[in-house]
Amino acid sequence: MSTKLSEIAAGKTVVVTSVVKDEIFLKLMEMGCVPGEKITVEQIAPLKDPISIIVAGYKLSLRLNEAQYILVDEI
C-alpha cells in the first residue's frame, strides 16, 4: 500500500509509485521524482516544511504541499 512522501520519517528510503496531482507532475518529473525512482528522506524541518530529500544523486527540498502528492512504497 502506498504512503504519501510527506508521512515518511527522516532516514527512510522509498520508491515513488505515482504523483497524484497533474499540476505539479511536470515540475516533480523534472526534478527526478518519477515512478520507480528511489528517494531518501534526508531531513524534515520542525514544522514538516520543507522536506529535504535525495533523488537521483541530488539534494532537493520539497514543500509539504508538494510531498503530499507523491505516493511511495518503503523498500
Q: Predicted segment positions?
A:
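Compact, glycine-rich, soluble single-domain proteins
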Residues: 1-75
